[in-house]
């Protein structure tokens, strides 16, 4: 008799859960959704799925606005930061050269080392001969000088300094090769299945590839788990070495786009122009990734188009928090008359 009552209770609850459009019982997880401006809830269940196919046109549940946005970049993606929901995609799994957007992973590992206590912002970082030989963007480190982690992060985030990137990698892992192993391990943990890192800075190297989807994943991890990084990624102009070294952010959106919070630019002759751009407006945080844009102007313009599309068509609402009681349900023919 007791067993039959329990069965009736379970069946009743199941029916109620599927019929009534109300959040019931205690929330076991944060109930977070993305809503479009027509009032329709956007499903977030596929936010990290590996089932998304190579192109947005062929993938399931990946909105594609290529025709209306007119993007010329080889690959692009727009995601909502809190849920990871894909709001737009174009060739999101195409493997391309990331250039200095690679440094998002380098910065992530630095921030994780700080949060774990293995590193502090005040630690002094030496510069090796190897670090001084880096080409591309740099602040011309000298083997006789040391900079703090705080200063190194500023140089990496603002001017994409390759010499500082290598110095940090060597300090954390003993060598750049060992650090790259850590980068690839972390990429696998994040489900970045399109990615193979060959270096920590992003200069062109055969086999050093990733996708806009994967860049969005590591960007999301960095911004969500380590929001303090925005202290660096939102700097427009600053200086080092007692004002002798001037820094101007390579990400022009920091100056020109309302709500911009980062994140990282990258370009080489082979990669063309890349960008991971983040912004927040009205509690909605978005990440737009552009890869293989024809010109630097195109990458910023097209990132703006993606962000504008997101802010104009979606909004963010948190309906309940974990453990919060949000309602009661009447139980028919059950031991208890209602459950919370």
Enumerate the language-model features and the residues they cover:
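Extended aliphatic helical segments
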Residues: 2, 11, 34, 62, ...
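N-terminal secretory targeting signals
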Residues: 1-73, 319-340
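Domain-terminus/edge residues, biased toward the C-terminal soluble/receptor-binding domains
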Residues: 5, 192-196, 204-340
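Active-site-adjacent loops and short helices of periplasmic peptidoglycan-processing enzymes
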Residues: 27-226
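A generic structural signal for short, solvent-exposed coil/turn residues
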Residues: 11, 19, 68-70, 117-119, ...
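Basic side chains
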Residues: 5-8, 90, 103, 186, ...
């Amino acid at each position: 008799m007791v067993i039959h009552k329990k069965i009736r209770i379970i069946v009743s609850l199941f029916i109620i859960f599927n019929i009534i459009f109300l959040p019931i019982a205690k929330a076991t997880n944060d109930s977070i959704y993305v809503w479009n401006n027509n009032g329709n809830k956007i499903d977030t269940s596929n936010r990290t799925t590996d089932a998304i196919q190579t192109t947005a046109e062929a993938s399931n549940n990946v909105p594609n606005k290529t025709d209306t946005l007119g993007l010329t970049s080889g690959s692009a993606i727009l995601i909502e930061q809190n849920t990871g929901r894909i709001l737009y995609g174009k060739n999101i799994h195409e493997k391309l050269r990331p250039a200095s957007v690679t440094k998002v992973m380098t910065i992530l590992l630095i921030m994780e080392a700080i949060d774990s206590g293995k590193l502090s912002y005040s630690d002094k970082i030496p510069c090796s001969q190897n670090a001084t030989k880096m080409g591309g963007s740099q602040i011309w480190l000298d083997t006789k000088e040391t900079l703090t982690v705080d200063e190194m992060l500023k140089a990496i985030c603002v001017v994409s300094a390759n010499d500082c990137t290598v110095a940090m990698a060597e300090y954390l892992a003993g060598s750049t090769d060992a650090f790259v192993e850590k980068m690839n391990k972390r990429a696998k943990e994040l489900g970045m299945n399109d990615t193979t890192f060959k270096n920590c800075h992003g200069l062109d190297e055969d086999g050093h590839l990733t996708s806009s989807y994967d860049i969005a994943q590591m960007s999301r991890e960095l911004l969500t788990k380590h929001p303090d990084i925005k202290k660096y990624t939102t700097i427009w102009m600053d200086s080092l070495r007692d004002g002798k070294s001037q820094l101007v952010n390579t990400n022009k959106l920091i100056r020109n786009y309302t709500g911009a919070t980062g994140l990282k630019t990258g370009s080489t002759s082979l990669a063309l122009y890349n960008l991971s751009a983040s912004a927040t407006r009205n509690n909605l945080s978005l990440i737009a990734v552009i890869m293989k844009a024809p010109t630097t102007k195109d990458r910023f313009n097209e990132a703006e188009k993606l962000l504008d599309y997101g802010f104009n068509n979606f909004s963010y609402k948190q309906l309940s928090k974990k453990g919060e009681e949000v309602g009661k349900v009447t139980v028919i023919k059950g031991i208890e008359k209602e459950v919370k």
